[in-house]
Amino acid sequence: MSGIIATYLIHDDSHNLEKKAEQIALGLTIGSWTHLPQLLQEQLKQHKGNVIHIVELAEHEHTNSYLRKKVKRGIIKIEYPLLNFSPDLPAILTTTFGKLSLDGEVKLIDLTFSDELKKHFPGPKFGIDGIRNLLQVHDRPLLMSIFKGMIGRNIGYLKTQLRDQAIGGVDIVKDDEILFENALTPLTKRIVSGKEVLQSVYETYGHKTLYAVNLTGRTFDLKENAKRAVQAGADILLFNVFAYGLDVLQSLAEDDEIPVPIMAHPAVSGAYSASKLYGISSPLLLGKLLRYAGADFSLFPSPYGSVALEKEEALAISKYLTEDDAFFKKSFSVPSAGIHPGFVPFIVRDFGKDVVINAGGGIHGHPNGAQGGGKAFRTAIEATLQNKPLHEVDDINLHSALQIWGNPSHEVKL
């Protein structure tokens, strides 16, 4: 294989999966086949999409009810020749799912890139090992927290929040994805002020914290804004990838003048991936494609919290981010939304040590503030790695957190 193989979930009311698959393969490549003269068929054969796999799935009554018709469901795979497209994500997505995405009854499940095609993508600049080297933390999950309620607040408020989170033992603090360039907390001022706070905490407490600042602006201004952030001392760039496009992420990741990790936020991705019947699968969108395009971190809804993904999907995202691949470094999985210390044993069980535990309200909502919230998480992480049940840990911050949010791991065998 020198091109790409697309895997689709299809629904067909004519109950002929073979015909539907062939129509897709032709429609996204040469357009027609059987009515072409023999000579033209020979000329176009190397450009034709080829159906290589068809499996019928069991009938699904909920699907029939939703679509208001009886359909046959199936998984199909089509191989698209590399000759047909340039080696970039806009061309690949348009080839494999462009006008097909308008069908409304087809879901792009996966894309399998040939080695020849993979060579055209950067992958993460730092990856898991590189991020761990920056923090000098190699033996546990990382802990990340989020600035909360920053809109309409000034730099002084940001500095106080940042200091408390860092003292609490948080490894990474990220901007809220809805904090854009503004007069109260402009980009470079956030970075410079944040660096001062974090350096002070490091000198006093010996704990290093990185700050992920939100990279925003018009698309053609992003590189300039990113370079300004780097010059000001940015540790990490948070980026709302799907508001801009995967190719924009790749462009940032490939730029040698932007030598910092990139953290991909999933904002807007639900518009592409939320339906089970159409769109693009979450594992492909938030896992494989983000990694290939250069994300060092991928945030996605956890299977436990307030905006939950199904566990199978969340684990599939993580698999794509972390599986061995000779072409790409591994990206950090960041299962997010509604996370509190009681979920730490589940996160470590399901995602392993190479994960970023990301919390907002679970840190800021602690009775002892963000310092207490961070310490509760760090204690929960340490106890989990020692296989110690959280309810047996003698720690006031963790105990307070479990009283507020509960301890689901106490009720479930891990």
From Swiss-Prot:
InterPro entries: Diketo-Methiopentyl-P_enolase, RuBisCO, RuBisCO_lsu_C, RuBisCO_lsu_C_sf, RuBisCO_lsu_fd_N, RuBisCO_lsu_N_sf. Pathway: Amino-acid biosynthesis; L-methionine biosynthesis via salvage pathway; L-methionine from S-methyl-5-thio-alpha-D-ribose 1-phosphate: step 3/6. One of its GO terms (biological process) is carbon fixation. The active site is at K99. Its cofactor is Mg(2+). Keywords: Amino-acid biosynthesis, Isomerase, Magnesium, Metal-binding, Methionine biosynthesis. Its EC number is 5.3.2.5. It holds the Pfam family RuBisCO_large_N. Has no RuBP-carboxylation activity. This is 2,3-diketo-5-methylthiopentyl-1-phosphate enolase. It comes from Bacillus cereus (strain G9842). The gene is mtnW.
